[in-house]
């Protein structure tokens, strides 16, 4: 009898002890979450409790009021330093824990990104390691260590579900070798805010600015807030996008970036506008040649090809790379609609254009001839030339297959969804550069008619300036 009552008493004590443990555990979790969500209030309450225990209630209230007044004065009077030292670090830690680390196991399990333990069906599955989290103003970067047996394609197939789980606008999966230094790592770019939603005014070059570097021509901004620059020297650039997607923004941003070199006579832009010249006529004073009808376009093509072949003959065996001078400037062939070049009714003209275009793309890079071409409707003919363009920019498109045609299938799998770009954001797109497997999201400058007129007035080539002075 006594043994039964003793066992009953021990069971009651065990139950009460477990209850206390659960209460303390839940209280601790609640306080931790409270501190994460309202760090200022939690800090003041902690100060009040400690002061009350050490000095009494009166001093606790006084100290709390003084601290609260000091914090609010700091926050209102010096918001930048408060955000840098207190606000941003706390918000970053809170987002890291609440959005990513706390739910990481559950999110991976729900999306089939865990692997069962061999021979232990009832054990917890293996979960990919979330090795690093970096919070950004618009894009968070997560470095994930893949499990043995996983590949980036497993994750790329789940980007839509992961975006919904993180409460993000989109998720892009990219190889993490360059960033993390390990081949089994991938990088998740979680975009929770669109930093490219608003138009970006053109950063006008100064009329007396130094000559532009052809290896770094600024044309816009990346979604991380850094300048978006394209390499023109030794490269060809292909720009694809639907009507109103912002192809003109990219082309005019490139012209604006090249303007100091145009004025110095080191860059000669030859513009071909097969659609009748409406888009680029306002900037004609900037161009070395401007053609918009079949006859004049063919004339420019032939002259440029002759110049290219003559340069190649002269530089062969002397140098591997052309250096622009006023006597031999770097030639930029600007084509507003690539597909229209081959749309002439005359079969002989079409064959000649195809031949000349192939020569430029194959031989022009080494002798100072760069092709910058825009295309509206990617076709099989354009896809055949795609590999000859080291830099490709995909703006808003109407179909999924067009993204793969302009960029690549791998770029689409990484999250370059050109067909999902809103029609209200012209100039937004994805850029893929030869030698870099990662796709970047960017937006070109918004170039107005006033900007074009200003460029045309201040950056004429030397030949036009001398002709005007005469």
What are these regions (language model features)?
Residues 146-154, 227, 321-326, 379, ...:
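Short acidic, glycine/proline-enriched loop segments that cap or flank alpha-helices
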Residues 2-4, 101, 114-124, 137, ...:
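Phosphate-binding P-loop/Walker A region and its immediate neighborhood
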């Amino acid at each position: 009898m006594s043994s039964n009552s003793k066992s009953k008493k021990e069971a009651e004590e065990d139950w009460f002890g477990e209850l206390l443990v659960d209460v303390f555990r839940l209280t601790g979790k609640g306080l931790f979450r409270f501190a994460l969500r309202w760090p200022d209030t939690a800090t003041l309450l902690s100060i009040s409790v400690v002061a009350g225990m050490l000095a009494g209630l009166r001093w606790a209230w006084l100290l709390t009021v003084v601290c609260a007044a000091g914090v609010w004065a700091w926050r209102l009077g010096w918001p930048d330093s408060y955000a840098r030292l207190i606000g941003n670090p706390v918000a970053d830690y809170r987002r890291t824990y609440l959005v990513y680390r706390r739910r990481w196991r559950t999110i991976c399990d729900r999306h089939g990104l865990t692997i069962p333990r061999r021979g232990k069906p009832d054990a917890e599955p293996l979960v990919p390691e979330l090795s690093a989290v970096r919070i950004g103003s618009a894009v968070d970067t997560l470095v994930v260590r893949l499990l043995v047996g996983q590949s980036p394609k497993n994750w790329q197939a789940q980007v839509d579900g992961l975006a919904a789980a993180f409460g993000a606008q989109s998720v892009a999966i990219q190889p993490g070798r360059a960033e993390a230094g390990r081949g089994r790592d991938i990088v998740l770019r979680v975009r929770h805010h669109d930093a490219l939603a608003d138009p970006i005014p053109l950063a006008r070059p100064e009329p007396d600015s130094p000559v532009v570097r052809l290896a770094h021509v600024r044309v816009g901004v990346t979604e991380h807030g850094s300048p978006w620059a394209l390499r023109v020297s030794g490269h060809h650039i292909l720009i694809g996008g639907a009507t109103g997607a912002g192809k003109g923004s990219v082309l005019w941003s490139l012209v604006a970036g090249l303007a100091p070199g145009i004025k110095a006579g080191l860059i000669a832009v030859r513009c071909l506008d097969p659609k009748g010249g409406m888009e680029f006529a306002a900037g004609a004073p900037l161009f070395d040649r401007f053609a918009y009808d079949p006859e004049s376009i063919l004339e420019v093509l032939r002259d440029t090809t002759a110049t290219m072949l003559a340069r190649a003959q002269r530089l062969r065996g002397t140098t591997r790379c052309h250096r622009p001078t006023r006597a031999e400037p770097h030639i930029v062939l600007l084509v507003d609609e690539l597909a229209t070049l081959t749309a002439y009714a005359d079969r002989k003209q079409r064959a000649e254009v195809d031949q000349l275009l192939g020569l430029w793309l194959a031989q022009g890079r080494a002798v100072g001839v760069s092709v910058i071409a825009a295309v509206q409707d990617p076709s099989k003919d354009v896809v055949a030339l795609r590999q000859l363009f080291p830099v490709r920019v995909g703006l808003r498109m109407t179909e999924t297959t067009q993204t793969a045609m302009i960029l690549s299938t791998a770029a689409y799998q990484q999250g370059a969804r050109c067909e999902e770009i809103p029609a209200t954001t012209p100039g937004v797109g994805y850029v893929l550069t030869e030698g870099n497997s990662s796709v970047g999201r960017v937006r070109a400058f918004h170039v107005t008619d006033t900007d074009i007129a200003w460029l045309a007035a201040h950056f004429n080539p030397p030949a036009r300036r001398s002709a005007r002075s005469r």
